């Protein structure tokens, strides 16, 4: 009888450092890591010349199900994740209809995800006006935390949180022992500048970029940190687009505030000039920034002040990206399939980011922050979630390579150094040779988190 169900042989295993080793898997769990494992296996994979990374964890995706599967859906969205080396995602509460703001809406989303997810998943709940009293229902069902917007959401059925709603939501999250995630932009500034531009018929990409200045983000980050520190909750700032924003978070951590932040590949790879060149496919909020902001953000990533990198995959149908009016175009970037490839290309190859830091930014830190036990690292007892990467494999991303419902992405046409060749979920290959090779097998992951864990 074989000692293992699977052995991944001879790859460069990334865990703390890098070592050429085998990974033995039994019953979907990593049971041994070391050179020349003995005992045999029912399946062996030759990983010589490949990086063996923990499967990425994308803590920020919008799959729009139930109710808006014309936009994406768990089936196509998680196929794209598998193709990009991601084995666990956390799906956002807005854009679905109904949004995830109470127990009933959670149940609908959970059923949809269980039926069609190709990778494991967790779910965020929402903080919106009039629904703070329903947060306990969501906590009891296993949400990973709660998301709030400080600026307009673009979705009428998920309202932005006014300051009192945000503060009281933070107090409730603290009581429940769960984190609050905040989209931090000052709504008064962004709304007023947008009205000024559109009333003057200034609706180009440059006009849109100017309507969401960095100061709107910086002010909101500072305000969110203050409210969270007073409420006593764990705070996470999503999609920070400036190095100065990260610096505010780092300074607050030095003062003892329980706060972390993420950024996204599009803020690390693209500039405002790219947004002008690409058009609506590159519209997002906060927007893409000038080159000096990109460099400052990379400095913070390399200094260790950014906890992790997420895709903020936010797709829509093609008609919502059509036209020349950038204020009307949907503000979201499709990019979850490119999360790991983007960091391999620009981080590992372009900036000298070591593989072990790549694993921290895309896996370990996410699992630790949000309490995903058994995830995020290649260690005995953890789920056998692996991404096998050819670090020298170059490719140009084409529309036909994308697994999204709609092949719209600013990454199309970009050359990447580093290719995901196989994705393994709990010991089972789900992506290989450019194809998703298994049916929906994703499981719901509940957080196991102690209050104050950082």
Swiss-Prot record:
Record EC number: 3.5.2.5
Binding residues annotated for Zn(2+) 2, in chain numbering: 147, 183, 239
This protein's UniProt keywords: Hydrolase, Metal-binding, Purine metabolism, Zinc
InterPro entries listed in its UniProt record: Allantoinase, Allantoinase_bact, Amidohydro-rel, DHOase/Allantoinase_Hydrolase, Dihydroorotase_CS, Metal-dep_hydrolase_composite, Metal_Hydrolase
Top-level taxon of the source organism: Bacteria
GO biological process, one term: allantoin catabolic process
Modification type N6-carboxylysine: residues: 147
Disulphide bonds in the chain: none
Free-text remark on how the cofactor is bound: Binds 2 Zn(2+) ions per subunit.
The keyword NADP is annotated on this UniProt entry: no
GO CC list: cytoplasm
Pathway where this protein functions: Nitrogen metabolism; (S)-allantoin degradation; allantoate from (S)-allantoin: step 1/1
Any one GO molecular-function label of the UniProt entry: zinc ion binding
PTM characteristics: Carboxylation allows a single lysine to coordinate two zinc ions.
Listed cofactors: Zn(2+)
Top-level class of the enzyme under EC nomenclature: hydrolase
Binding site for Zn(2+) 1: 60, 62, 147, 312
Catalytic activity as recorded in UniProt: (S)-allantoin + H2O = allantoate + H(+)
Pfam families, alphabetized: Amidohydro_1 (PF01979)
Record's function text: Catalyzes the conversion of allantoin (5-ureidohydantoin) to allantoic acid by hydrolytic cleavage of the five-member hydantoin ring.
Family named by the database record: Belongs to the metallo-dependent hydrolases superfamily. Allantoinase family.
Complex and partners: Homotetramer.
Protein's recorded name: Allantoinase
Organism listed in the record: Rubrobacter xylanophilus (strain DSM 9941 / JCM 11954 / NBRC 16129 / PRD-1)
């Amino acid at each position: 009888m074989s000692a293992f169900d699977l052995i991944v042989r001879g790859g460069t295993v990334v865990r703390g450092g890098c070592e050429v080793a085998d990974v033995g898997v039994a019953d979907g769990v990593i049971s041994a890591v070391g050179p020349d494992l003995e005992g045999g296996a029912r399946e062996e994979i030759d990983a010589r010349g490949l990086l063996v990374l923990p499967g990425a964890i994308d803590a920020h995706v919008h799959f729009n199900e139930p109710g808006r599967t014309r936009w994406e859906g768990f089936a196509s969205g998680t196929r794209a994740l598998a193709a990009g080396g991601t084995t666990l995602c956390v799906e956002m509460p807005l854009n679905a209809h109904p949004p995830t703001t109470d127990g009933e809406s959670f149940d609908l989303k959970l059923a949809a995800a269980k039926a069609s997810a190709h990778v494991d998943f967790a779910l965020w709940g929402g903080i919106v006006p009039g629904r703070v009293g329903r947060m306990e229902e969501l906590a009891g069902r296993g949400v990973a935390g709660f998301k709030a917007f400080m600026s307009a959401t673009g979705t009428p059925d998920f309202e932005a949180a006014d300051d009192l709603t945000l503060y009281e939501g933070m107090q409730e999250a603290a009581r429940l022992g769960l984190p609050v995630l905040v989209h931090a932009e000052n709504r008064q500034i962004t709304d007023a500048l947008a009205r000024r531009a559109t009333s003057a018929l200034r609706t180009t990409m440059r006009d849109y970029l100017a309507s969401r200045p960095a100061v709107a983000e910086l002010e909101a980050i500072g305000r969110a940190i203050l409210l969270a520190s007073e409420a006593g909750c764990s705070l996470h700032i999503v999609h920070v687009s400036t190095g100065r924003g990260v610096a505010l978070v780092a300074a607050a951590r030095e003062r003892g505030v329980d706060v972390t932040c993420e950024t996204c590949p599009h803020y690390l790879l693209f500039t405002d000039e790219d947004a002008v060149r690409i058009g609506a496919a590159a519209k997002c909020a906060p927007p893409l920034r000038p080159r000096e902001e990109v460099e400052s953000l990379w400095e913070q990533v390399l200094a260790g002040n950014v906890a992790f990198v997420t895709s903020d995959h936010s797709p829509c149908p093609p008609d919502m990206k059509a036209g020349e009016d950038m204020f009307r175009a949907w503000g979201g970037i499709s990019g979850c399939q490119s999360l790991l490839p983007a960091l391999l290309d620009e981080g590992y190859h372009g900036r000298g980011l070591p593989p072990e830091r790549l694993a921290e930014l895309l896996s370990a830190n996410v699992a630790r922050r949000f309490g995903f036990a058994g995830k995020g690292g290649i260690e005995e007892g953890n789920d056998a979630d692996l991404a096998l990467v050819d670090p020298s494999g170059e490719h140009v991303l084409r529309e036909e390579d994308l697994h999204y419902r709609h092949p719209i992405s600013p990454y199309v046409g970009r050359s990447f150094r580093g290719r995901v060749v196989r994705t393994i979920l709990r010991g089972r290959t789900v992506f290989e040779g450019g194809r998703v090779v298994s049916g929906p097998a994703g499981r719901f992951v509940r957080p196991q988190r102690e209050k104050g864990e950082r």
